[in-house]
């Protein structure tokens, strides 16, 4: 009788433990301790950029292909694990890609370095920045940029608004986005789409007359900063004309509705 009761209690304990499995994210972001502020998103993106060596997205890298895994920052010691943290912390618990790293796919299998496009982590990076900055459950975390671009364009996000690149000047902490490959010709008028498409988004971290500095993940296999030309009005382009950037066709700005510009002036 005692054994049966002990077994029942043990099973009940195990079931309760499974039901209350720990969240992927730290407590301070699961239920944000501080407001979701612009300054934190910029600081987090900048911190990650410095971790990867403060690399700049140079025009000379266009079309460059690594000859070995050692030429890919995402696969280097200390950095492949960091990419794994972008996946793990940036994705929701039901997303299988949350178990990936900079060189591992499902189950911890190392994928060929020539096949890393299937494991593109730029959206995981943006999701990570937004989550750690304190967006809570308001950001549409996803392994695909199209998810939150479409959510913003369709009015399905409480903290994102899709803005035309020729009329809205991106602010610090906003996201600028472009299509890639088959989606390279997407325009603002195409949004929202009924399908997922390959793309790239980056966080605006600095602005000077004529230039925005943006930080994005998985840019030539690293976190890199890109200099983006803007008009005198601060927009990516002028009405009826292509965007000024001749390298990348940025076609939408995601205005992020932060709770505040910076944390409250208290530290007690």
Q: Which positions does each model-derived feature cover?
A:
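Low-complexity, Gly/Ser/Thr/Pro-rich intrinsically disordered linker/tail segments
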Residues: 221-268
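Surface-exposed intrinsically disordered loops and tails
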Residues: 73-74, 95-107, 156-158, 187, ...
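N-terminal capping segments
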Residues: 22-135, 265-268
């Amino acid at each position: 009788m005692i054994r049966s009761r002990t077994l029942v209690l043990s099973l009940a304990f195990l079931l309760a433990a499974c039901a209350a499995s720990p969240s992927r994210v730290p407590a301070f972001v699961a239920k944000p301790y501080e407001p979701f502020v612009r300054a934190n998103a910029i600081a987090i993106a900048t911190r990650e950029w410095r971790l990867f060596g403060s690399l700049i997205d140079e025009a000379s890298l266009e079309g460059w292909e690594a000859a070995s895994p050692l030429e890919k920052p995402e696969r280097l010691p200390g950095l492949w694990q960091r990419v794994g943290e972008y996946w793990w912390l940036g994705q929701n618990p039901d997303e299988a890609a949350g178990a990936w790293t900079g060189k591992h796919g499902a189950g911890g299998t190392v994928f060929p370095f020539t096949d890393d496009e299937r494991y593109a982590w730029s959206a995981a990076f943006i999701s990570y920045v937004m989550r750690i900055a304190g967006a809570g459950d308001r950001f549409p975390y996803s392994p695909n940029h199209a998810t939150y671009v479409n959510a913003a364009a369709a009015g399905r996000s409480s903290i994102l608004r899709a803005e035309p690149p020729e009329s809205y000047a991106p602010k610090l902490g906003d996201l600028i986005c472009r299509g890639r490959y088959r989606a390279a010709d997407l325009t603002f008028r195409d949004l929202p789409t009924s399908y997922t498409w390959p793309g790239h988004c980056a966080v605006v971290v600095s602005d000077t007359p004529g230039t925005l500095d943006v930080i994005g993940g998985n840019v030539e296999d690293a976190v890199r900063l890109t200099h983006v030309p803007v008009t005198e009005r601060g927009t990516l382009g002028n009405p009826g004309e292509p965007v000024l950037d001749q390298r990348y066709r940025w076609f939408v700005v995601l205005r992020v509705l932060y709770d505040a510009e910076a944390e409250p002036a208290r530290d007690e």
